[in-house]
């Protein structure tokens, strides 16, 4: 069974020859460039200049030899976006600064900095108004340059029998709105001025539909999975109440998913939402989510055995292979092995599972733990 057959089989809730393996197909299933360099060396691969899938997060785009050496099954398509396109860094004293296409300023410490963090939002607090939303210079997601060459790349990946995932070019309705006006301010608006918050959410929907309605007529037949993201969970609960999600966010996501269904009916719909999103899972299913990521196994309510029991016939689980908060960075190789074995035992029966870490692999993860994860997966991820 080849990689694409393996992915399609598991997404149809059947058991392939082994669990499909993802590392790096999206900007939420990736690996930090420092960890990537060390892992290449551990597998005897030569040094190479790192190409980034996401410069803001410092994520490496895995090279062909790495994909082959580790037995990775899935390749990613990355439309041009603020994290990988025209990233021009300027000197800001102790920081590197980057002004992106949304008008958001990011900064990274020059000394030991690993990531760019948001420093200034363009419509922060009182700057947000109906007029400022209307007049802000929003990015153009109908620009064909955003997907230039992606169909040819996807077809190349398919010719080599890989599964192909295309990522949404910007963060989710809720999360991208936070980046525009500030998280604290948006949360207050949702409670005190939901109509104003709604105008910003509607703009995000408009931009997403601009992208998918122009990109999918070109790419729909060349992708197996379309990946979208919006974080609603914390370690123990949700960032907003389920009622607020259902009233203000859910109907807007349904518009986006309906657009994707219209233009790419055969592609599976992947949705990333960190933390404890257990109360929202039925809502995700209702709007059209078919694949849930990351399966935050150490968050309250996200026990993989219970999730598989309750939703294993409705959702493909993608991720959750090893805890990236504690065990992978701070545990022993044996603890990593046991965690991988447990999560495979919970999630792989009956298909409907793709192996990946709970979230991106960070720079401080010991290489021996990554090797333990990969080799344990290879040993126990077989049907």
Label every model-predicted segment.
Residues 1-40, 45, 49, 98-99, ...:
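Active-site loop segments of alpha/beta catalytic cores
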Residues 2, 58-65, 93, 145-148:
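Generic alpha-helix structural propensity
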Residues 65-69, 86-99, 153-159:
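Short, charge-rich binding segments
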């Amino acid at each position: 069974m080849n990689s694409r057959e393996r992915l399609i089989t598991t997404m149809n809730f059947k058991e392939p020859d082994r669990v499909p393996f993802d590392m790096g197909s999206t900007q939420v299933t990736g690996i930090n460039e420092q960890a990537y360099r060390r892992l290449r060396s551990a597998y005897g691969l030569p040094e190479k200049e790192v190409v980034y899938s996401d410069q803001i997060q410092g994520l490496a785009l895995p090279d062909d030899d790495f994909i082959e050496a580790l037995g990775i099954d899935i390749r990613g398509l990355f439309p041009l976006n603020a994290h990988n396109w025209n990233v021009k860094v300027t000197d800001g004293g102790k920081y590197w600064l980057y002004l992106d296409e949304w008008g958001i300023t990011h900064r990274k410490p020059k000394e030991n900095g690993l990531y760019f963090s948001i420093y200034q939002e363009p419509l922060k607090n009182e700057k947000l108004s109906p007029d400022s939303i209307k007049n802000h210079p929003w990015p153009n997601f109908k620009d064909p340059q955003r997907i230039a060459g992606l169909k040819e790349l996807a077809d190349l990946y398919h010719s080599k029998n890989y599964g192909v995932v295309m990522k949404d070019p910007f963060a989710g309705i809720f999360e991208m709105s936070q980046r525009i006006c500030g998280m604290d301010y948006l949360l207050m608006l949702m409670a005190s001025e939901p109509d104003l918050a709604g105008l910003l959410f509607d703009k995000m929907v408009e931009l997403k539909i601009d992208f998918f309605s122009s990109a999918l007529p070109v790419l729909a037949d060349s992708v197996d999975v379309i990946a979208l993201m919006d974080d609603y969970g914390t370690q123990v609960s949700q960032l907003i109440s389920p009622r607020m999600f259902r009233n203000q966010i859910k109907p807007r996501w349904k518009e986006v998913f309906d657009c994707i269904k219209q233009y790419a009916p055969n592609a599976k719909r992947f949705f990333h939402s960190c933390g404890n999103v257990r109360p929202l899972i039925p809502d995700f299913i209702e709007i059209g989510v078919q694949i849930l990521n990351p399966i935050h196994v150490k968050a309250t309510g996200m026990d993989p055995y219970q999730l598989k029991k309750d939703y294993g016939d409705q959702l493909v689980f993608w991720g959750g292979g090893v805890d990236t908060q504690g065990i992978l960075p701070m545990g022993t190789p044996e603890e990593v092995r046991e965690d991988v074995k447990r999560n495979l035992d919970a999630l792989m029966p009956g298909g409907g599972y793709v192996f990946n870490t709970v979230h991106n692999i960070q720079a401080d993860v010991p290489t021996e733990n990554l090797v333990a994860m990969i080799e344990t997966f290879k040993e126990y991820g077989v049907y």
